[in-house]
Amino acid sequence: MTNYYAEITGWGKCLPPAVLSNDDLSTFLDTSDEWIRTRTGIENRRISHVNTSDLATVAAKQALARAGITAQDIDLIIVATCSPDSLIPNIASMVQKNLEIEAAAAFDLNAACTGFVYGLETGTRLIQSGAYRHALIIGAERLSFYIDWAMRDTAVLFGDGAGAVVLSRTEEAVGLQNAKSGCDAQGRDILSVPKFGTSMDRFAADNGYWDFNFVGKEIFKRAVKGMGSAAAHVLAHAGMSKDDINVVIPHQANIRIIQTLCDLSGIDQSKAFVNIQKYGNTSAATVPIALCEAVEQGHIKAGDNILLAAFGAGLTWGAGLVKWGQRVEAISESDAALPECDKSALELLKNAIELCNARRDK
């Protein structure tokens, strides 16, 4: 029986053009650039003027071009998201429609910030079964839709964006080698949007607002523990040590979490790719966006061992060990882009900020 692997052959990203800076946030929140940067490492984040599926589609087109294949070669699409355009149907089908793919398995996956790592393992296992040849694995979020813009603790953290990879079937021992995923369900309430879904009062007058529960200190402790144990598991299972890792792609939630994860794992912080300062926490999109930029900037080289680690609501956690193939250059480039945005981030958020503040004042 042939042993198949799923090589990452293409990579792409999509960041909306409207930038919301820390100084912008200080115009309507009791905060400052210094307060946010020192506690989170974040300086800017992006605010989308389009739907989550639009972000996902642009990232997917970039990944396809860099893989040197067409959309018609794709037979599996997995979109990791907790902020879809619609509940029914899934947005993977919208991405499929946008790419004009006639027939492919397409579904969404919600594991919050760990979603891309879950999706990467799921896609890899399906390709290894021999049933699929090329897969699009996408992490895409429009978290600005959920944010209570009167609540400082969460308003400063999140941003919008998408990242994507193409997985291609191969007999070479590259791609995801080992993975460990799990969920600490006892802590599911400390990071949640609890009233979105059938648990909310559908006919409530204030049905345009949802609480965003966020217990920062407890999340920090559980994030480091979850990602750390998962990372240790995949390294041990692969018979590798921390010194064998060339690059770490961690979930971009908080610079302190990234630093603590590296310190507790004994991995040099210089190996961790960090771009949280530019985009904030884009949930399921952080890992693929960071992976894409790490390749673009030359941090990932042929044959590198890459450690992925993420943590999210649920409380989900996961890690994966990826063996990069021999190609780090794009075969082609895509000119795919979002439609132009004629508003600033503050202008895009104006109505949401006013309504959130009005509710807080009641």
Swiss-Prot record:
Entry GO CC: cytoplasm
Name the Gene Ontology molecular function terms of this record. 3-oxoacyl-[acyl-carrier-protein] synthase activity; beta-ketoacyl-acyl-carrier-protein synthase III activity
State whether keyword ATP-binding applies.
Answer: no
Where mainly found?
A: cytoplasm
Q: Where is the active site?
A: 113, 251, 281
Recorded catalytic reaction(s): these are:
malonyl-[ACP] + acetyl-CoA + H(+) = 3-oxobutanoyl-[ACP] + CO2 + CoA
**So what EC number does this one have?**
2.3.1.180
* GO biological process entries: fatty acid biosynthetic process
SUPFAM superfamilies in UniProt:
Thiolase-like
Keywords recorded for this protein, A-Z:
Acyltransferase, Cytoplasm, Fatty acid biosynthesis, Fatty acid metabolism, Lipid biosynthesis, Lipid metabolism, Multifunctional enzyme, Transferase
What subcellular locations does the record give?
Cytoplasm
What is a single Pfam family found in this protein's UniProt entry?
ACP_syn_III
Q: Which pathway does this chain act in?
A: Lipid metabolism; fatty acid biosynthesis
Where is the stretch described as ACP-binding? Answer: 252-256
How it assembles, according to the record, is: Homodimer.
Q: Which PANTHER family match?
A: 3-OXOACYL-[ACYL-CARRIER-PROTEIN] SYNTHASE (PTHR43091), BETA-KETOACYL-[ACYL-CARRIER-PROTEIN] SYNTHASE III 2 (PTHR43091:SF2)
Q: Give the family per the record.
A: Belongs to the thiolase-like superfamily. FabH family.
Q: What does this protein do?
A: Catalyzes the condensation reaction of fatty acid synthesis by the addition to an acyl acceptor of two carbons from malonyl-ACP. Catalyzes the first condensation reaction which initiates fatty acid synthesis and may therefore play a role in governing the total rate of fatty acid production. Possesses both acetoacetyl-ACP synthase and acetyl transacylase activities. Its substrate specificity determines the biosynthesis of branched-chain and/or straight-chain of fatty acids.
HAMAP family given in the database record: FabH
Q: What is known of its domains?
A: The last Arg residue of the ACP-binding site is essential for the weak association between ACP/AcpP and FabH.
Show the NCBIfam families listed in the entry.
fabH, PRK09352.1
UniProt name for this protein? Beta-ketoacyl-[acyl-carrier-protein] synthase III 2
What gene is behind this protein? fabH2
